């Protein structure tokens, strides 16, 4: 084989190895951030499981992590909203669950809107080049929206308290408990982002 061909093959092999090691390093870095950040979340195991399986952009810092957590929560809320709407429309007006379902659909709709607003704030968060005052204002908005979303999730669940157990109640509790838990974890990540912000020039968020 000619020397030129040998060099070409060596170059290709090196490129493949370098790319693989880089991807592996990023993956390990993301796993480290996820595990360390989820340790004190409201639901640590769920936190690790959902964020580890996140298929969005690579998580390289805490801002990425907070955005990923909110996206996961938003996805669960949107899925639950669709299911709840179907159940609401299929239940007779005289059923005791009807009023609770109507309220729950409204609550989860508000939750979806609030999580979307939270995500919008995080996407435009000034982690560098901005003043501490501006950062605090942005974080206050993100925390307010995420907290409101969690409140709406809990309010939906509260609407079924005192009702007889049944298929509808069981399904709604299952869906909304999952939404509330991932939202609680997401709120924790947003709060952690605020606590670890540091100075205005800190870009390792």
Curated annotation (Swiss-Prot):
It comes from the Eukaryota. The keyword Secreted applies. GO terms for biological process: regulation of shoot apical meristem development. Residues 1-25 form the signal peptide. Disulfide bonds join 38-47, 104-156. One of its GO terms (cellular component) is apoplast. Keywords: Apoplast, Disulfide bond, Secreted, Signal. Induction: Down-regulated in leaves during infection with Botrytis cinerea. InterPro entries: Invertase/methylesterase_inhib (IPR035513), Pectinesterase_inhib_dom (IPR006501), PME_Inhibitor (IPR051955). Expressed in apical meristem. SMART domains: PMEI. CDD domains: PMEI-like_3. One of its GO terms (molecular function) is enzyme inhibitor activity. It is found in: Secreted, Extracellular space, Apoplast. Belongs to the PMEI family. NCBIfam families: PME_inhib (TIGR01614). Pectin methylesterase (PME) inhibitor that can target PMEs (e.g. PME2 and PME3) in a pH-dependent manner, mainly in slightly acidic conditions (pH 6.3 and 5.0) but not at pH 7.5; this processus relies on changes in the protonation of amino acids involved in intermolecular and intramolecular interactions. Regulates de-methylesterification of pectins in the apical meristem and affects primordia formation and phyllotactic patterning. This is Pectinesterase inhibitor 3. The gene is PMEI3.
């Amino acid at each position: 084989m000619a020397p030129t061909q040998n060099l070409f093959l060596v170059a290709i092999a090196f490129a493949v190895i370098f790319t693989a090691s880089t991807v592996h390093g990023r993956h390990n870095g993301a796993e480290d951030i996820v595990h360390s950040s989820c340790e004190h979340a409201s639901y640590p195991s769920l936190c690790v499981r959902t964020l580890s399986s996140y298929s969005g952009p690579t998580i390289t810092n805490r801002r990425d992590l907070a955005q990923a957590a909110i996206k996961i929560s938003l996805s669960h809320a949107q899925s639950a909203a669709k299911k709840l709407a179907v159940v609401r429309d299929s239940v007779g007006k005289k059923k005791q669950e009807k009023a609770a379902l109507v309220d729950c659909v409204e609550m989860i709709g508000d939750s979806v809107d609030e999580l979307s607003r939270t995500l919008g704030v995080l996407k435009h968060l000034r982690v560098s080049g901005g003043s501490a005052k501006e950062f605090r204002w942005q974080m206050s908005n993100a925390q307010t929206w995420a907290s409101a979303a969690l409140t709406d999730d809990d309010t939906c669940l509260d609407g079924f308290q005192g009702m007889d157990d049944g298929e509808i109640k069981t399904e709604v509790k299952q869906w909304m408990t999952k939404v509330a838990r991932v939202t609680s974890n997401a709120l924790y990540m947003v709060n952690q982002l605020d606590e670890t912000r540091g100075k205005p020039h800190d870009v390792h968020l």
